[in-house]
């Protein structure tokens, strides 16, 4: 967190001097007036400069980005992280020559990075956005794969009338399957979750 103490003939001038030194705009800093300054008698005697302290505001989303980038580069070398923010979510997308190393088996490494980044963001008060971490557009490809799998398994359930239990997967992936099968085959299919923690999984069954 950068900070600077600056002086000027008045508070505004001191603030501008500090902003220029930090290379920031006024909305990016916290300003404390240490001395308001004094023009002095006839502008000469007793004259005192205004003194202010500027402290760079912490941007939780950018701090989480730096945290993620540090981990990504420790695993996959030089990496870039871009951020897309909406009202309820923050999406971090990692690119780099070895970004595929960050995915892991069925996205397990990516899911771990997502959890760590979510925890890093949650450290800051008032930050309640859902975090998504992606690399090599894995999330989109995975969504397409899961949707196709859901349809295939649902058709099997319709044919055999026997429930199918899927392997454990994160809530975001369970939701993809649930949404895909919502209303499928005239609402003959239902999905629900079972298990706890890492063993929580989805069941696809026929409505009797």
Curated annotation (Swiss-Prot):
Gene3D superfamilies from the UniProt entry: 3.30.300.20, probable RNA-binding protein from clostridium symbiosum atcc 14940, R3H-like domain
Domain of life: Bacteria
Annotated spans, Jag_N domain: 5-55
Domain R3H: 140-208
A Gene Ontology biological process term: cell wall organization
SUPFAM superfamilies, alphabetized: R3H domain
InterPro entries: Jag_KH, Jag_N_dom_sf, KH_dom, KH_dom-like_a/b, KhpB, KhpB_N, R3H_dom, R3H_dom_sf
Span of domain KH: 58-135
MF (Gene Ontology): RNA binding
Disulfide bond sites: none
Coiled-coil ranges from the UniProt annotation: none
Predominant cellular place of this UniProt entry's protein: cytoplasm
Localization: Cytoplasm
A single cellular component GO annotation: cytoplasm
SMART domains the UniProt entry points to: Jag_N, KH, R3H
Keyword line: Cell shape, Cell wall biogenesis/degradation, Chaperone, Cytoplasm, RNA-binding
Quaternary structure, from the entry: Forms a complex with KhpA.
NCBIfam families referenced in this protein's UniProt entry, alphabetically: Jag_EloR (NF041568)
Family label: Belongs to the KhpB RNA-binding protein family.
Domain notes: Has an N-terminal Jag-N domain and 2 RNA-binding domains (KH and R3H).
Biological role stated in the UniProt entry: A probable RNA chaperone. Forms a complex with KhpA which binds to cellular RNA and controls its expression. Plays a role in peptidoglycan (PG) homeostasis and cell length regulation.
Name of the protein in question: RNA-binding protein KhpB
Organism the protein comes from: Bacillus subtilis (strain 168)
Lineage: Bacteria, Bacillati, Bacillota, Bacilli, Bacillales
């Amino acid at each position: 967190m950068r900070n600077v103490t600056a002086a000027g003939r008045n508070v505004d001038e001191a603030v501008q001097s500090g902003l220029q030194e930090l290379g920031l705009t006024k909305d990016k800093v916290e300003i404390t007036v240490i001395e308001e300054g004094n023009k002095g008698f006839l502008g000469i005697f007793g004259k005192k400069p205004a003194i202010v302290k500027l402290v760079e505001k912490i941007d939780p989303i950018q701090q989480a980005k730096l945290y993620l980038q540090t981990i990504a580069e420790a695993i996959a070398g030089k990496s870039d992280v871009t951020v897309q923010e909406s009202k309820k979510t923050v999406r971090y997308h990692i690119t780099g020559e070895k970004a595929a190393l960050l995915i892991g088996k069925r996205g397990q490494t990516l899911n771990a990075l997502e959890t760590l980044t979510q925890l890093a963001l949650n450290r800051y008060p008032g930050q309640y956005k859902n975090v998504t971490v992606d690399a090599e557009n894995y999330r989109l490809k995975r969504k397409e794969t899961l949707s196709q799998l859901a349809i295939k398994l649902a058709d099997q359930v319709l044919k055999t009338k026997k429930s199918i239990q899927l392997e454990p997967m994160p809530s975001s992936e369970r939701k993809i399957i649930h949404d895909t099968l919502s209303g499928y085959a005239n609402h003959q299919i239902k999905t629900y979750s079972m298990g706890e923690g890492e063993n929580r999984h989805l069941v696809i069954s026929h409505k009797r």
